[in-house]
Every structure is written in structure tokens, then in C-alpha cells.
Amino acid sequence: MFILSAVSSSSSSSSSVPSSLPPFSLSPSISLSFSRVSLPPSSSSSSSSLKLFLPLSLHFTPPKLSSPHSFLRFSASRAMAELIQDKESAHTPSTTDVTRNDPPHSRAFLDLRSEEELLSCIRRETEAGKLPSNVAAGMEELYQNYKNAVFESGNPKADEIVLSNMTVALDRILLDVEDPFMFSPHHKAIREPFDYYTFGQNYVRPLIDFENSFVGNLSLFKDIEEKLHQGHNVVLISNHQTEADPAIISLLLEKTNPYIAENMIYVAGDRVIADPLCKPFSIGRNLICVYSKKHMLDIPELAETKRKANTRSLKEMALLLRGGSQLIWIAPSGGRDRPDPSTGEWYPAPFDASSVDNMRRLLQHSGAPGHLYPLALLCYDIMPPPSQVEIEIGEKRVISFNGTGLSVGPEISFDEIAASRDNPDEVREAYSKALYDSVAKQYNVLKAAIDGKQELEASVADVSLSQPWI
């Protein structure tokens, strides 16, 4: 599971919501810290340096858990203090190795044959002092909710699927409790000796109702993959709905575009690499880790240290883009979509124009051809977020079996929008709004297909739905 948070400026305004959408309330956006960084020009760019205000990342290590009387929650302030202390205590690489040698650890969960044995094992490991009681409570809740969702699918092998997937998940969670994994600003998916990517795919797959799931504009995904193979960079400007977004995106594309599914890099918030129930799933994804400004001042005396540490992630992203052939997913709303509290309707949260513009400028100065595409994702029922953004790490995970949707829109030309406007701020806002409008339109088509039961007939002129797995 993943908590993915996007880059967001602390001062810029958001794109307006299209008039075609009903009014709705937005949860507070998650904004990130910015540092001014000058980057030397690439060989193919001009001699002037690129200066950006862009959110950057710390080198993260998992914070220690607080009182077991709280349910899988710990102080964000304490967590960050320990994180900074760990970072300053040792030099670590900016990019995580793509392998992780499993250290000796309890493998108690792997040989279980029933629900009774699984629950008993959680209690036994807790009594032995190997599991904090709050993590154990989280494991039990995750098991029950996952079991209910898989059984909801009607799969005749639900018993086998639940036990197989949950024993592996609990084994990986316990391993990380015993030997916490440390994420670097640029984390590469760990595929061996244990394949964390395949583990995440297998875990989320039973939650997707593929008969009621759709992909929009499959031909554009093919175009994107061709551009990547030609050395171009591509950034997908997307909405963000659940912790499981990366797995859902990959599962919807694994039949037709496995290269995209496996090589996408996600801009990820600090929660994705701190929550003990999320970390094993995050280890299997390519990440650029960022820290939300919302928590920057939790411990004021550490704020400057964090900002200085953040410069490493900007440099990592810039270097990646200069090498070409990079595919980066980012949600410039600053967090997961939330429903309108008065109607319960879900819509993509507005984009932060500065975040969009920063990504555009990074592409422009990379020295390789770059493209921004609007991407829409509908999957909130699989694992909806809390109704409000929470400060504490750890959240109740409601899980269900449901249809999902993914659609990409045509690339939107910045130059065409800039040609009709003189004010740079107006250009920036107009470009961000154009991307958002495309995402909102695609989202409405997916919503009509899935929630409205229109299926493939929901397709419109510029959003062609398909089900390539059928």
C-alpha cells in the first residue's frame, strides 16, 4: 500500500474547478518545502543555470513507534526528530540499491495454514516482544479487512488467496520491524532476492473488479512508451486517490504496457516510507521521496536541516531527467482526493500551478525532449483515505473489491497556451488549468463507465475506453 503525496507550492493558487463540475469542499492540500537550487547546465542547454523552487526529499528512515496504547500511530514530531538524527549519524547514498539481502529474521508467518494460526502467530510474536502491540493491532485489522474484500469478489479460491498474500505481507512487515529499511531520496524498486514489486501486484490484484475496470486511450500509452525508448522524458500529471494507486496503475497496464508498469517513478510523500504497514509495498516501487511542508515546522529547530537535506532529491530528479527515458508520476494537488462532505461525490482535487510549472521547467532544462500528459485515475473504493488529512502517521484501512479506471489524455502544448498570453503568471495558471480540465473530463468518463454502469459506452470522442485483459 502506498501513501503518495505530490509536490505543491506553499504560496501559489490552485487551478479553478471547471464550471461543469458541482462545487465541493477540498481537504487541506499537502504542500512541500522549497529550496532555491542552482543546477549547472547540461551539455545541450544554455549556459545560464536553472533556478527552481521545488520540493525536495530527506533521506528517510522509519520512525520508531510510540506508545502501544495508540493504534498504529506515533508522533510526527518525534518521528522526524529521530529521522534527522539517524540521517546525521551516517552517510548514505542518494540512490537505493536495487537489491536487499534479507537479514536473519523470524519467518513465523510463512508456514501458517489457517486464519487461526495466523492470528495466533500475531499474538505470539507480540508476547515475545518482536511486535509492538499497535503494529500487531494494525496487522489484525489489515487481515480482516483484506479478507472481507477478497471474499466480496466471489473468487472460489478466496481462502487460498487471502492466506497466501497475507502471510507474505505480515512476514515483510515483521522483517521491517526487526530490521527497518532505509529509503534514499531516489529509491529503486527492490526486485531481488525478494521481488517486492511482484508481491505488491499479487496483493492488490484480487481487489480489482477487472470486469468493471477500464483504460482510456490505450494508444496514447503506446505513444508514451515509444517516446521513452527514444530517450524522451515523460511526466504524468495525475490526480491521486488511494495508497494503492501505483499497484492499480501497474495492474491496469501490465498486459499492454509492462515497461511503463514496472519503470514508472512515483513522487512519494514521507508517509509512504514511514508507516510500518505501507513500507513493504513502497519498497517495490521506484520513488522520489519528498517531505511535506505541512510537517516542516513540527520541530522548528530542525526545519533548516530538513531544507538543506532536501536539495539532494532535486538534484536526483534533475540528474535522472538529464539521462532521458524517465517516466515520472506526480499528483500536483498535494495529496489524495477527498469526497465533498455534503454530497459524498469524489472529484480530482485542484492542481497547484507552481508544482506543474516546476515539473515543466525541469523537463525543459533537462537537455532531453520532454512531455507532460494529463492522467486520470479512479479507484477510491478500493482503499479510501480518511475523510480529512491527518497529522499522525498510521490510519484505519478500509478495503473493498471494486472496479477501477485509468486514462491518459493528449499532451497539452505549453507554447500554444503561452502564445496567447503575456503575463507569465497567467500562462502558468492557464497551463495548469488545461491539464486539470483534461484530468477532470477523463475522470468523469471513467466515473460514468464504472459507477454509472455505462461501461464501454461511456467513451467519448477524445476518451476511448477499452478492457485489454478481456
From Swiss-Prot:
Catalytic activity: sn-glycerol 3-phosphate + an acyl-CoA = a 1-acyl-sn-glycero-3-phosphate + CoA
Keywords per UniProt: Acyltransferase, Chloroplast, Lipid biosynthesis, Lipid metabolism, Phospholipid biosynthesis, Phospholipid metabolism, Plastid, Transferase, Transit peptide
Superkingdom of the organism of origin: Eukaryota
GO biological process: CDP-diacylglycerol biosynthetic process
InterPro entries reported in the protein's UniProt record: G3P_O-acylTrfase_chlp (IPR016222), G3P_O-acylTrfase_N (IPR023083), GPAT_N_sf (IPR038114), Plipid/glycerol_acylTrfase (IPR002123)
SMART domains: PlsC
Pathway assigned to this chain's UniProt record: Phospholipid metabolism; CDP-diacylglycerol biosynthesis; CDP-diacylglycerol from sn-glycerol 3-phosphate: step 1/3
Region of interest: Disordered: 87-106
Coiled coil region boundaries: none
Family indicated by similarity: Belongs to the GPAT/DAPAT family.
Entry function: Esterifies acyl-group from acyl-ACP to the sn-1 position of glycerol-3-phosphate. The enzyme from chilling-resistant plants discriminates against non-fluid palmitic acid and selects oleic acid whereas the enzyme from sensitive plants accepts both fatty acids.
Name of the protein: Glycerol-3-phosphate acyltransferase, chloroplastic
Protein's organism: Cucumis sativus
